[in-house]
């Protein structure tokens, strides 16, 4: 029995109110991507959603302000993917630019620590002198870790974008656009986007408190962090809604103009990408995988160090390390695929018997598993 297949056509939104002077093809493309108004085509920073709509952000910036004034040791705890690496680097760079000198970071090791702010990671932060923990791209499910930090007298600010569970960790402040009581219109911010909004809010709070005037310094231009926002947003494959399109476009524009971190320049070089011709797909398929390779095979601290690096020469060395890890990752995945295909071929006789004797069809595919396959690569391999 031959199975019939049909591609489903996604109809464009005919109610979209787009500019009349747009070419018909562009109108259809925009409408098919869910763009319904001219406002959603805005690409300037003026079109960004205001940070004031993020619940919990006012409490977070007040805690950070007091930490700045008191010289509190702040540890940023990130995640071991590209979004986590860019979130970590952005938060450290942002707070340093805002006038905080007593700050460092910690990225859990996927193989030794597992995901998120676990009690073990809290102990590591404590050993590094943490007096305040700020999570980025994780923490919304870290109930045990936050509780453990509380017993040690370490307050925690959670910044995350993952969906919350039925209960929230007992943190001093939580910023997540997907909280049930959060009125922030975009629910698609990546972790790096949430971290960027926190820096925007903190700069405003510090300025209103006279922080910059007291130190006779100018408020930093946080647009300089948008290259990291673009990279993390695209690499995390979050939907590019109107707000994320602005963040990504602005970051891409800075990279194309050569106004980006040395680490991103080094990644572009090792990937043979021309910055002036850079597209969002390059962030997702060239730079992102090289960053992710560190977290999948080794330690994402290498990726964060690359993004924090101020020297292009040092950045090139780190980018070469990531490129080598990515090549190893590809070779391992190819081996996994070859093994899986051999397994599937050996099952062909079984599949034929299903069809001939029981008159049924396997619709949902075949699950392949091996205890020798690397856990960190299984999700990528499965997607292929």
Language model features by range: what are they?
Residues 132, 136-150, 154:
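Phosphate/diphosphate-binding loops
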Residues 90, 169-213, 225-229, 234:
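Short alpha-helices
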Residues 79-80, 108-111, 138-139, 161-164, ...:
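Short, ordered loop/turn segments at secondary-structure junctions
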Residues 154-169, 384:
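Short, acidic/small-residue loops that bind anionic groups at enzyme active sites
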Residues 66, 166-176, 264:
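Acidic-glycine-rich active-site phosphate/pyrophosphate-binding loop
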Residues 143, 168, 189-192, 196, ...:
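Amphipathic alpha-helical transducer elements in NTP-driven molecular machines
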Residues 121, 145, 167:
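Short acidic active-site motifs
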């Amino acid at each position: 029995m031959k199975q019939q297949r049909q591609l489903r056509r996604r109809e464009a939104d005919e109610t979209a109110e787009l500019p009349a002077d747009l070419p018909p093809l562009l109108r259809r493309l925009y409408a098919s991507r869910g763009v319904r108004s001219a406002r959603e085509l805005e690409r300037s920073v003026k079109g960004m959603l205001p940070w004031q709509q993020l619940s919990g952000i006012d409490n977070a910036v007040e805690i950070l302000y007091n930490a700045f004034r008191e010289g509190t040791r702040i540890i940023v705890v990130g995640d071991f993917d590209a979004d986590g690496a860019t979130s970590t680097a952005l938060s450290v760079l942002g707070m340093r630019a805002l006038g905080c000198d007593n700050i460092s970071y910690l990225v859990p090791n996927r193989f030794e620590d597992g995901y998120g702010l676990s009690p073990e990671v809290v102990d590591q932060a404590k050993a590094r002198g943490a007096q305040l923990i700020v999570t980025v791209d994780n923490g919304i499910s870290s109930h045990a870790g936050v509780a453990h930090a509380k017993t040690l007298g370490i307050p925690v600010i959670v910044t995350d974008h993952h969906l919350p569970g039925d209960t929230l960790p007992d943190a001093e402040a939580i910023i997540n656009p997907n909280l049930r009581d959060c009125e922030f219109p975009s629910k698609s911010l990546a972790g790096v986007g949430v971290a960027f909004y926190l820096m925007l809010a903190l700069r405003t709070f510090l300025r209103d408190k006279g922080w910059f005037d007291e130190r006779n310094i100018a408020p930093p231009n946080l647009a300089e962090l948008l290259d990291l926002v673009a990279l993390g947003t695209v690499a995390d494959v979050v939907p590019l809604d109107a707000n994320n399109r602005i963040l990504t476009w602005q970051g891409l524009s800075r990279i194309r103009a050569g106004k980006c971190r040395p680490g991103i320049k080094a990644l572009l070089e090792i990937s043979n990408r021309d910055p002036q011709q850079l597209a969002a797909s390059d962030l997702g398929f060239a730079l992102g995988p090289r960053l992710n390779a560190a977290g999948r095979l080794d330690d994402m601290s290498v990726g964060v160090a690359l993004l924090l690096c101020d020297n292009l020469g040092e950045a090139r060395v780190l980018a070469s390390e990531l490129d080598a890890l990515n090549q190893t990752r590809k070779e391992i995945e190819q081996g996994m695929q070859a093994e899986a295909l051999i397994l599937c071929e050996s099952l062909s006789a079984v599949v034929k018997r299903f069809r001939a004797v029981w008159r049924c069809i396997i619709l949902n595919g075949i699950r392949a598993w091996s205890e020798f396959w690397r856990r960190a690569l299984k999700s990528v391999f499965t997607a292929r």
